[in-house]
Regions:
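Functional cation/ligand-contacting sites centered on basic and imidazole/sulfhydryl donors
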Residues: 1-45
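Phosphate- and other anionic-substrate recognition elements at nucleic-acid/protein interfaces
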Residues: 43-224
Length: 224
């Protein structure tokens, strides 16, 4: 550029072209397109649920990092992750249970969509690690967590569904032969739908929420 007032063309992290001067950019690096996307301004502020709104809380649960998304009448309004680094499985399960109670209490969903668990396929081969077939221990760990989440929803009188992975992926048109390819495909789709770049856990949770909000309707809860 020739001087501080020369127009520059730069690209933001989301791939949008920004036309501005270095005088402005060096003070505040801001993309006008991203600024208008409310999903880019994710905060901890709880959005009150409007009357007659159907709200879905979707979970891509795991014992260390769980993705979540919240939809109001098929519209994504919030997404993120919950992380815990506690050493014992039961401690992590308890932390996620308490987090779910907090999310339900604060966000007041009509439905909680939980990703169903599945045994990981190993290409027809049994691969042993110690005295366990690889995949079985992870399956058991996720089964424990799934049961805890289901029981928590039951105790709080919240409707819930289990979303089989192949089902929600087919609904969202997630492609790919390998697990890594399907994870990447979900991230690309989220970028296409909402113009946001998200983690694998967030992408899956957003896909689960999209599937649940577009295919399931249950009674609306009259929260006090």
């Amino acid at each position: 550029y020739k001087n501080l007032d020369s127009e520059l063309i730069v690209e933001c992290p989301e791939g949008h072209r920004v036309y501005s001067t270095w005088k402005k950019l060096r003070v505040k690096k801001e993309c006008p397109v991203c600024k208008q996307n409310i999903l880019k301004e994710i905060t901890t502020k709880i959005i009150p649920k409007k009357k007659d709104t159907y709200r879905v809380l979707a979970l891509d649960q795991a014992t260390y990092i769980s993705g979540f998304s919240i939809y109001d009448d098929k519209k994504l309004i919030r997404y993120g992750t919950f992380e815990t680094a506690l050493s014992e499985e039961i401690e992590r399960d308890d932390a996620i249970r308490k987090w779910l109670i907090s999310m339900v209490t604060n966000w007041k969903p009509d439905l909680v969509a939980i990703e169903d668990i599945q045994m990981q396929q190993l290409g027809g081969k049994q691969v042993y690690g110690g005295d366990n077939v690889v995949g079985i221990q992870t399956f058991k760990t996720l089964a424990h967590l799934q049961g805890i989440l289901m029981e928590t929803c039951f105790e709080m009188d919240i409707s819930f569904i289990l979303c089989p992975t192949p089902t929600w992926r087919a609904h969202c048109q997630v492609k790919g032969r390998s697990r890594a390819d399907r994870k990447k495909s979900a991230q690309i789709l989220v970028k296409e739908w909402f113009d946001i770049s998200v983690s694998e856990d967030e992408a899956d949770a957003i896909g689960i929420g999209k599937y649940a909000s577009e295919t399931h309707t249950v009674r609306k809860i009259q929260w006090q």
